């Protein structure tokens, strides 16, 4: 007899072998019908997999996150089933789960059209309605190769070639369609009803632009119809907030083919940039940072010495002059070490906090570029703290407090923290990495925050704390980082004089709050749907006259607002006021000021905030209200 321990601690006995599906059926018909898969001794398994020893078993249903991901993975296989029925010559490649969805890469003779995707979705619904079982068969490797050879699935054969040698592999049969996978998958297509194919894109085989282009069909799947509906509404809202669309509508920036991944900032967009940069500069000055500026281009030998050439050269732009080879900087950190090294440093100088709005360039693949979110030329709100080991925790706490306060000022109150640990490709010994990772854990503990850990996600020179903000649509964006580095000071020979008159290496803390300013502006545009809070808006007020009689008073109002520090524009066009209000509304200015004869006579302004009419206000009182609104946002938040 087998002893099966369930999550509530109860133990049930079964004849050996037993499956998760059989265990669920013995508990109740409702649970049996809802069973997607199981977790046996911590490992996810198919509902049909035999259990042959005493085990701890959890039954996975669509209510579990793992259940949702299994449904999504099975939907990807269903895409394959539908595609092969409609387009028999198509070659299936890979179909993984991604956040909130899945995709399948497919090789076709000609690109799919939106009409093709609609036909594939319709066929998937027809297949789901057949309510067929998904059958798993553990198949000898040689037989699996034969199956795919007979079906002409060349990409599956290439994938098998790359896999470790195994005696048997999981083959999942959707009627006549078969696909290979580690699994688990749903036992029946009834679990796949709440899905939607969302978009079509191109993707290179193995992500290499030198390889052939494939067709990528994206989709999503959920446990319930309501969850699917809510997701679709969220995606539709995200499309309305797309920073590329709003960037054009609000006249903030544009991109063009002649400068891929480089941004052309328009006056309003550059005004927004300057508001952010000046605000960050003020916060950094108050926190004890000294601003510096380092060269854009440095000799290749410098990057070899820092370790960037060995670990990062594929992402670096290079050039040559007078028989010397140079690289455009992808990061600011080595330059800051040079400033630290320029002069004899004492323990009394530590911590030394050097900040730079540093312009960097990285040779990102063209297919990965995406508006402001993924660019080749960008500016980081970068800073490096040179300190002793004893100062790590206090500096981390101060940084954490600064970061959280700034995020709140920008409207982000939900912040999660991750600790990224050593990657496979890295500089420095394991002892150094042990020390660095433990140092960041101690710092996080001192900050009193909860965190998750991400093995293999650290930078090549050190582990890092990642700060993720959640936006108005519930999406998570990684922005801030704090990285602990013992390696770069060693490689670039940074040192200071200790209290005992000895020489020692400083610890280097790499830190950013916004990350790339370009990307952060993209996030802000989408989070606020282009309707920026008053303190942040590139144009805070637009002042409009009803007739020419009020033009001079409008100029006086604008001058008074500008003298009080506000970014105000005039609209004195000879147009009807209704038209001017509608026309200016598309730019989503926080306030619209309308001036008629009555306002001019009484030294007042008629105020509109978005679509709300606030009535006629005394100008001085209105300025005081604006000042209080900004104080509340930046100080009281």
Swiss-Prot record:
<dbReference type="GO" id="GO:0000049">
    <property type="term" value="F:tRNA binding"/>
</dbReference>
<keyword id="KW-0547">Nucleotide-binding</keyword>
<dbReference type="InterPro" id="IPR012947">
    <property type="entry name" value="tRNA_SAD"/>
</dbReference>
<keyword id="KW-0820">tRNA-binding</keyword>
<dbReference type="GO" id="GO:0005524">
    <property type="term" value="F:ATP binding"/>
</dbReference>
<dbReference type="InterPro" id="IPR012676">
    <property type="entry name" value="TGS-like"/>
</dbReference>
<comment type="function">
    <text>Catalyzes the attachment of threonine to tRNA(Thr) in a two-step reaction: L-threonine is first activated by ATP to form Thr-AMP and then transferred to the acceptor end of tRNA(Thr). Also edits incorrectly charged L-seryl-tRNA(Thr).</text>
</comment>
<keyword id="KW-0479">Metal-binding</keyword>
<comment type="subunit">
    <text>Homodimer.</text>
</comment>
<dbReference type="InterPro" id="IPR002320">
    <property type="entry name" value="Thr-tRNA-ligase_IIa"/>
</dbReference>
<feature type="region of interest" description="Catalytic">
    <location>
        <begin position="242"/>
        <end position="533"/>
    </location>
</feature>
<dbReference type="InterPro" id="IPR004154">
    <property type="entry name" value="Anticodon-bd"/>
</dbReference>
<dbReference type="InterPro" id="IPR012675">
    <property type="entry name" value="Beta-grasp_dom_sf"/>
</dbReference>
<keyword id="KW-0067">ATP-binding</keyword>
<keyword id="KW-0963">Cytoplasm</keyword>
<dbReference type="InterPro" id="IPR047246">
    <property type="entry name" value="ThrRS_anticodon"/>
</dbReference>
<dbReference type="InterPro" id="IPR018163">
    <property type="entry name" value="Thr/Ala-tRNA-synth_IIc_edit"/>
</dbReference>
<dbReference type="InterPro" id="IPR002314">
    <property type="entry name" value="aa-tRNA-synt_IIb"/>
</dbReference>
<feature type="binding site">
    <location>
        <position position="333"/>
    </location>
    <ligand>
        <name>Zn(2+)</name>
    </ligand>
</feature>
<dbReference type="Pfam" id="PF00587">
    <property type="entry name" value="tRNA-synt_2b"/>
</dbReference>
<dbReference type="Pfam" id="PF03129">
    <property type="entry name" value="HGTP_anticodon"/>
</dbReference>
<dbReference type="InterPro" id="IPR004095">
    <property type="entry name" value="TGS"/>
</dbReference>
<dbReference type="Pfam" id="PF07973">
    <property type="entry name" value="tRNA_SAD"/>
</dbReference>
<dbReference type="GO" id="GO:0004829">
    <property type="term" value="F:threonine-tRNA ligase activity"/>
</dbReference>
<dbReference type="GO" id="GO:0046872">
    <property type="term" value="F:metal ion binding"/>
</dbReference>
<comment type="similarity">
    <text>Belongs to the class-II aminoacyl-tRNA synthetase family.</text>
</comment>
<dbReference type="GO" id="GO:0006435">
    <property type="term" value="P:threonyl-tRNA aminoacylation"/>
</dbReference>
<dbReference type="InterPro" id="IPR033728">
    <property type="entry name" value="ThrRS_core"/>
</dbReference>
<dbReference type="Pfam" id="PF02824">
    <property type="entry name" value="TGS"/>
</dbReference>
<dbReference type="InterPro" id="IPR006195">
    <property type="entry name" value="aa-tRNA-synth_II"/>
</dbReference>
<keyword id="KW-0648">Protein biosynthesis</keyword>
<keyword id="KW-0694">RNA-binding</keyword>
<dbReference type="GO" id="GO:0005829">
    <property type="term" value="C:cytosol"/>
</dbReference>
<feature type="binding site">
    <location>
        <position position="510"/>
    </location>
    <ligand>
        <name>Zn(2+)</name>
    </ligand>
</feature>
<feature type="domain" description="TGS">
    <location>
        <begin position="1"/>
        <end position="61"/>
    </location>
</feature>
<keyword id="KW-0436">Ligase</keyword>
<keyword id="KW-0862">Zinc</keyword>
<dbReference type="InterPro" id="IPR045864">
    <property type="entry name" value="aa-tRNA-synth_II/BPL/LPL"/>
</dbReference>
<dbReference type="InterPro" id="IPR036621">
    <property type="entry name" value="Anticodon-bd_dom_sf"/>
</dbReference>
<keyword id="KW-0030">Aminoacyl-tRNA synthetase</keyword>
<feature type="binding site">
    <location>
        <position position="384"/>
    </location>
    <ligand>
        <name>Zn(2+)</name>
    </ligand>
</feature>
<protein>
    <recommendedName>
        <fullName>Threonine--tRNA ligase</fullName>
        <ecNumber>6.1.1.3</ecNumber>
    </recommendedName>
</protein>
């Amino acid at each position: 007899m087998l002893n099966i321990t369930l999550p509530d601690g109860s133990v049930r006995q079964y004849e050996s072998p037993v499956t998760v599906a059989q265990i669920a059926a013995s508990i109740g018909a409702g649970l049996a019908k809802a069973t997607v898969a199981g977790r046996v001794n911590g490992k996810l398994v198919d509902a049909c997999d035999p259990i042959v020893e005493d085990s701890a078993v959890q039954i996975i249903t669509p209510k579990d996150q793992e259940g949702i991901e299994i449904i999504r993975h099975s939907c990807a296989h269903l895409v394959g089933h539908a595609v092969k029925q409609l387009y028999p010559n198509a070659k299936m490649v890979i179909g993984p789960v991604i956040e909130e969805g899945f995709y399948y890469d497919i090789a076709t003779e000609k690109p799919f059209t939106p009409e093709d995707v609609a036909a594939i979705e319709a066929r998937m619904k027809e297949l789901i309605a057949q309510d067929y079982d998904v059958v798993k068969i553990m198949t000898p490797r040689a037989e699996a190769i034969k199956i795919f050879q007979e079906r002409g699935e060349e990409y599956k054969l290439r994938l098998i070639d790359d896999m470790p040698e195994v005696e048997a592999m999981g083959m999942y049969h959707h009627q006549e369609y078969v696909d290979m996978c580690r699994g688990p998958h749903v036992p029946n297509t009834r679990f796949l009803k709440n899905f939607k194919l969302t978009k079509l894109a191109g993707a290179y085989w193995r992500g290499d632009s030198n390889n052939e282009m494939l067709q990528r069909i994206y989709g999503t799947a959920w446990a319930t119809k309501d969850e699917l509906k809510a997701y679709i509404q969220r995606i539709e809202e995200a499309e309305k907030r797309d920073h590329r669309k709003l960037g054009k509508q609000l006249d903030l920036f544009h991109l063009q083919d002649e400068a891929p991944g480089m941004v052309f900032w328009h006056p309003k967009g550059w005004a927004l940039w300057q508001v952010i940069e000046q605000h960050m500069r003020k916060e950094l000055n108050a926190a004890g940072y000294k601003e510096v500026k380092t060269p854009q281009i440095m000799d290749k030998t410098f990057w070899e010495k820092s370790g960037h050439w060995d670990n990062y050269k594929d992402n670096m732009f290079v050039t040559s002059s007078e028989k010397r080879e140079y690289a455009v900087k992808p990061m600011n950190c080595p330059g800051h070490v040079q400033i630290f090294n320029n002069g004899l440093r004492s323990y009394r100088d530590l911590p030394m906090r050097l900040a730079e709005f540093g312009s960097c360039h990285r040779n990102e693949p063209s297919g990965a570029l995406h508006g402001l979110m993924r660019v080749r030329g960008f500016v980081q709100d970068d800073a490096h703290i040179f300190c002793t080991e004893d100062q790590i925790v206090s500096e981390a706490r101060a940084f954490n407090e600064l970061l959280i306060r700034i995020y709140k000022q920008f409207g982000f109150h939900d912040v999660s923290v991750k600790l990224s640990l050593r990657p496979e490709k890295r500089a420095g010994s394991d002892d150094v990495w042990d020390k660095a990772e433990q140092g960041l854990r101690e710092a996080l503990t001192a900050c009193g925050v909860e965190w998750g850990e991400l093995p293999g996600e650290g930078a090549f020179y050190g582990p890092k704390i990642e700060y993720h903000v959640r936006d108005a649509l519930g999406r998570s964006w990684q922005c801030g980082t704090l990285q602990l580095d013992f390696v770069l000071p060693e490689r670039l020979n940074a040192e200071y004089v200790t209290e005992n008159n000895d020489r020692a290496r400083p610890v280097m803390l790499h830190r950013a709050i916004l990350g790339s300013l370009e990307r952060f502006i993209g996030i802000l545009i989408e989070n606020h749907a282009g309707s920026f809070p008053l303190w942040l808006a590139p144009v805070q007020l637009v002042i409009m006259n009803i007739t020419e009689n009020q033009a001079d008073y409008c100029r006086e109002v604008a001058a008074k607002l500008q003298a009080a520090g506000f970014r105000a524009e005039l609209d004195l066009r000879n147009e009807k006021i209704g038209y001017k209000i509608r026309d200016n509304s598309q730019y989503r200015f926080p306030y619209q000021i309308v001036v008629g004869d009555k306002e001019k006579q009484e030294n007042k302004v008629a105020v509109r905030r978005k679509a709300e009419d606030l009535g006629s206000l005394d100008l001085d009182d209105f300025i005081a209200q604006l000042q209080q609104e900004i104080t509340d946002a930046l100080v009281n938040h």
